Structures are given as C-alpha cells and as structure tokens.
Design a protein with these regions (language model features):
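Hydrophobic alpha-helical core bundles mediating ligand binding, dimerization, or RNAP-core interactions
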Residues: 4-9, 28, 32
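Helix-loop element at the rim of GNAT/NAT acetyltransferase active sites that forms part
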Residues: 6-20
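Acetyl-CoA-dependent GNAT
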Residues: 16-81, 101, 151-155, 163-166
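A short coil/beta-turn micro-motif at the C-terminal edge
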Residues: 65, 112-114, 142
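Conserved acetyl-CoA-binding loop-helix of GNAT-fold acetyltransferases
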Residues: 76, 82-96, 115-123
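Conserved GNAT acetyl-CoA-binding A-motif
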Residues: 99-109
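Conserved catalytic-core motifs of GNAT/GCN5-like acyltransferases
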Residues: 107-110, 127-144
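Conserved active-site tyrosine of GNAT-family acetyltransferases
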Residues: 121, 126, 148
Length: 166
C-alpha cells in the first residue's frame, strides 16, 4: 500500500488526476482495502531492472457486467513515466479485457491538458468519444475532461492471449 500511496502523492500524479490535495496513508489504506473487496481487475506493472522485476505501476479495470464495459485506470511511478511502460501495460490490459473478460468496450476519462497521457492512450487504441466541459482542474485552472473509449476492433493485433488458446 505504501508504494502505491507514494506514487499517488507525486505532484505530477496529483495534477494528472485533478486532485487538489494529497491523501493520507490511512485513508489510502482503507480505499485500497475497499477496492480489493470489489470486482475490480488489477494488474501490477513491473519494470525489469537488471533482470529483477520491480513494481512501477498498476492498471485497473472497473467492470460493469450488465453492459460488458469497464472503466480503465492506470497509474505509474514517477520514475517509470516516459519509457513506454504505460502504453505497453494498457495494451496488455486491453488484450485481457477483450479476450478473457469478453468486454465489448473499455473507456476512461483524462484531463484535456494532460497531452502525454492522451497520446499514450491513443497509441494503445483509445479514441476521443466526447468532452466533459469544465469537469476538472489542471494546475489550479478549470479544464475539460476527455472521455475516451476503445472497442476490440480498435485494438491492433497481435494478441498475447489468443495464441495461448487451443
């Protein structure tokens, strides 16, 4: 929990999520315990440093089984950003979402000024589906939030999972 909490307290993470204040470790511990009891699908992102796996992020799918869709959330440690790990982790998570969980659509929200995140999501197969006007804050200023989504047909093959099936 402390590792994830540290990543979330990074100023760039706070800005990227549009939060105005950090969260206490106690509150985050309760929040993670609640999340782990739910139906969320979580994956830890690892970076192979000198051949040793080191956790550097997490991806999460928050499924809505009644309509076979899920919200997507990703968080990377500050030291893991800009290396392509977020895009790779997003592609793998989408592969799982579409080929194992059989979701029909995955969506996310991102603050419009967060251009690096928008580009990474586009590289992974997401498209802008709409704009939530004045829905967030970026560096203390009101900003729009983009709604992005992707379908199985939007995600480029190859699938890591498909070859494993008989």
């Amino acid at each position: 929990v402390e590792t994830y909490w540290r990543w979330e307290q990074d100023p760039a993470s706070l800005i990227g999520y549009g939060r105005q204040q950090p969260e206490s470790l106690e509150a985050r511990t309760e929040g993670i315990a609640h999340q782990l009891r739910g139906d969320n699908i979580r994956f830890t992102v690892y970076h192979l440093t000198d051949g040793t796996p080191e956790p550097v992020g997490v991806t999460t799918l928050l499924p809505d089984p009644s309509v076979r869709t899920a919200e997507y959330v990703v968080m990377l440690a500050p030291e893991a950003r800009g290396m392509g790990l977020g895009t790779a982790a997003t592609r793998l998570t989408l592969d799982y979402a579409f080929h194992i969980t059989n979701l029909r659509m995955v969506w996310l929200k991102v603050l419009a000024p967060n251009k690096p995140a928008v580009r990474a999501y586009e590289r992974a197969g997401f498209r802008t589906a709409g704009t939530l006007r004045q829905a967030g804050y970026w560096l203390g200023q009101v900003c729009d939030e983009l709604l992005m989504d992707t379908l199985s047909s939007d995600v480029s093959p190859p699938s890591v999972i498909s070859p494993l099936m008989p």
